[in-house]
From Swiss-Prot:
Name of the protein: Pantothenate synthetase
Pathway the protein acts in: Cofactor biosynthesis; (R)-pantothenate biosynthesis; (R)-pantothenate from (R)-pantoate and beta-alanine: step 1/1
EC number annotated for this UniProt entry: 6.3.2.1
Reactions this protein catalyses: (R)-pantoate + beta-alanine + ATP = (R)-pantothenate + AMP + diphosphate + H(+)
Binding site for beta-alanine: Q61
Cited Pfam families: Pantoate_ligase (PF02569)
GO cellular component, one term: cytosol
Family in the record: Belongs to the pantothenate synthetase family.
Primary role: Catalyzes the condensation of pantoate with beta-alanine in an ATP-dependent reaction via a pantoyl-adenylate intermediate.
Originating species: Ruthia magnifica subsp. Calyptogena magnifica
Oligomer status and interactors: Homodimer.
GO MF, any single term: pantoate-beta-alanine ligase activity
Predominant cellular place of this UniProt entry's protein: cytoplasm
Residues of the active site: H37 (proton donor)
């Protein structure tokens, strides 16, 4: 495993692999690695000859009142987890990514203005900005993202299409704790009791899916699910949308996604369930 701290180092490494006819898969992360990240690396290993992981806590996707300063930074544990799994790790500092400061704007379109984009209007611009920069530095053939951040996944796919980037975007399913809680770096913020309460998010979404498949009215189910969630959380959103484009479902919708973001105390949790209509 090769460690690269400079843009020139990682670019040279990947160029050498490409010269040898090797394909390269890329898994961008902010560190705080868990089994969910490792599952994406497993997919990357299946899709390419070489795998690069980046660790960079991106300030552009945090607003002033969010957890940039307290976001878990566990670089030693992360490198231990990666040692036998990847070929290279890119650990840039902020000057490598934003040499002229954070100023570039990427229009992510309507898909970035709904759901998380409504209450975190800065977020997807920041994500798209850093991902485009990382793609330009690493120049992978394949990049792998998790479905837990489903809206982010679609935003990145749209960005790649808009910019005509020759990168195949792959996705990995949500990895869950035995309790059903979706694995997330921010789960470290939860107390033991809060972690138990947090499992109710997935339980509610699972029941919502079950009832949709019984052909019950979605708008009625949505209100009932919100009542259920309000017993445990402060709701940011709960919506049922077309999984292909995050538009409202119709009779012609084949794949559905139920998405939700909630607050448990100060911790923001997101989750989703994707399924075929039946």
């Amino acid at each position: 495993m090769q460690l690269c701290y400079q843009n020139t180092q990682i670019t040279k490494l990947v160029n050498n692999w490409h010269t040898q006819g090797k394909t390269v898969a890329f898994v961008p992360t902010m560190g705080g690695l868990h089994q969910g990240h490792l599952s994406l690396i497993d997919i990357a290993k299946q899709k390419a000859d070489k795998v690069i992981v980046s660790i960079f806590v991106n300030p552009a996707q945090f607003s002033k009142n969010e957890d940039l300063d307290s976001y878990p930074r566990t670089i030693n544990a992360d490198l231990t987890a990666l040692k036998v799994n990847v070929d290279g790790v890119f650990i840039p500092n902020i000057k490598q990514i934003y040499p002229k400061g954070i100023s570039k704007y990427i229009d992510v379109g309507k898909i970035g203005q709904i759901l998380c984009g409504r209450t975190r209007p800065h977020f997807f611009n920041g994500v798209a900005q850093v991902v485009e920069i990382l793609f330009g530095i690493v120049r992978p053939d394949v990049a792998v993202f998790g479905q837990k951040d489903y809206q982010q996944l679609l935003v990145i796919k749209q960005m790649v299409k808009n910019l005509s980037l020759n990168i195949c975007i792959e996705s990995g399913e949500i990895i869950r704790e035995k309790s059903g809680l979706a694995m997330s770096t921010r789960n470290q913020y939860l107390s033991k009791n809060e972690a138990k309460i947090a499992t109710n998010l997935h339980k509610t979404l699972s029941y919502f899916k079950h009832e949709i498949l019984q052909n019950k009215k979605v708008y009625v189910l949505n209100e009932l699910a919100k009542l259920d969630l309000k017993q445990h959380f402060k709701i940011d959103y709960l919506e049922v949308l077309d999984a292909n484009n995050l538009k409202q479902i119709t009779d012609n919708t084949h794949q559905i996604v139920i998405l939700s973001a909630v607050f448990l105390g100060s911790v923001r949790l997101i989750d989703n369930i994707i399924f075929k209509k039946g």
